[in-house]
Amino acid sequence: MNKWSWWCPWTALGLAAGILMLWGVSLWTALLAALLLVCPALILWGLFKTSSLPQAAQETIPETRGMTLNWLAPFYDTLCRFYGLGRSFREETLRHATLKPGEHFLDVGCGTGVLTRLAAGIVGSSGLAVGIDPAPRMIAVARKNAAGSSQAEFRLAAIERLPFESGSFDVAMASLMLHHLPPNLKRDGLGEVYRVLKPGGRLIVVDLDRPANPLWWLLAWPLLMMPMTASNLRGEIPYYLRDAKFDPVHTQGRRMQLLTFWQAIKPMNPGEPS
């Protein structure tokens, strides 16, 4: 677990308590319920599931300045469903990508690979769907889930150095991963995604953004204490995209009052405005 990972359980606990409070449960009751019921169950389940995961043989674990969720891999999909980020959210995210058969798709920070597998079904055998993540257990789960039923490919890699030639992909996706990167890596990492996209290629980002109302500001305020998430809540993602030379950058929608979808285009003639 890297130095930022300990923020994750506390943030998840705070969000879970906030949801319980919206249901009329008092603060201390909500926190106690989460601590006594949710956390031990998740820890025990995670230990059980982790013991059965295949290990990535002969693969070098990439170094990254971002936060990885290696420890969360066994129950990541369950937590996503709990927070309303399950299959319907992934399908909505892919609709913003407008994928076509035969296209080459890159999922940066793919986690357990749900988006990558869905994309593989769209681009078909004439296309390519690749997911990368720096967390070995995430990649192990992704490969296990894709075995025998998907053309998706998964690689252990970090956004600092994407293991692909320049201009390799038509579409890239960064779903709920930029808030795991410090500000300087957001900028550098988006530049690396820009490099591997073809001219005219599109990047779809969905991530934390400025809360839409005072209630969500109240629930999200702990995230302002973390440099990785603070820039998201200040509404800076479009600026990072433009700094990486994407042009134009469009906002395509909102979800849950806290998430925004963006589409960013690599110009047909890089270096010139589109």
Language-model features and meaning:
Residues 18-63:
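N-terminal auxiliary segments of SAM/dcSAM-dependent transferases
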Residues 46-98, 114, 220, 224:
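Conserved class I S-adenosyl-L-methionine
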Residues 60-63, 83, 187, 204-244, ...:
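C-terminal alpha-helical "lid/dimerization" subdomain adjacent to the S-adenosyl-L-methionine
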Residues 106-108, 112-161:
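Class I SAM-dependent methyltransferase SAM/SAH-binding core
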Residues 124, 181-182, 197-198:
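Helix-to-beta-strand junctions that scaffold the AdoMet/dcAdoMet cofactor pocket
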Residues 160-171:
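A short acidic, Gly/Pro-enriched loop at the edge of an enzyme's catalytic core
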Residues 171-184:
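A short SAM/SAH-binding and catalytic strip from SAM-dependent methyltransferases
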Residues 187-199:
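A short glycine-rich, Lys/Arg-flanked "PGG" loop and its adjoining helix->strand segment in the class I
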